[in-house]
Amino acid sequence: TRLGLPEAMAEAIGLVKNTKTSADERRALTKLLSERRSTDALELLLGQFEEEKNSGRRIELMTALQRFKNNSVGTAMLARYAGMPQRERESAQNILSSRENWSLEFIRAIDAGKIKREDVRPATVLAMQSHKRKAIDALVKKHWGQLRQSTKAKQRHSQAKPWIALAKLS
């Protein structure tokens, strides 16, 4: 699938769907499918995320789905958010705050009372603010007031900026 051959993509999708495929192979194929970012891969991974019972596998699927820019990813995560265990919620917060549109959906869900403000980590709020979008900033201010990073956190963030930019390119 790295070459983008349609036959290879179809075979990878078939293997991920097959319950007899080993967990390790399924994990590797999920990663490859997310790298290709095809519509078929998105539909498969979203479907599996919505139906998966295993928490570890759901986190793998959320991580894979993060590579897609499609708004349906944020919508699917928010739909399951209330029923997620803590570890999944933390992963979901990281992912939802990583993209501007998903951040806006997430903070609107908080504003609507669907998600408790107290459950959102400060790092998540700061990540949402980093998008510098007025609608997000207004809701952050409404629910958390003025948040600022510590000097140490700013230093870590500035050191990580080149790596973050590189990750966004992939």
Question: Where in this protein do the model-derived segments appear?
Answer:
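Long, ordered, helix-rich scaffold segments
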Residues: 1-170
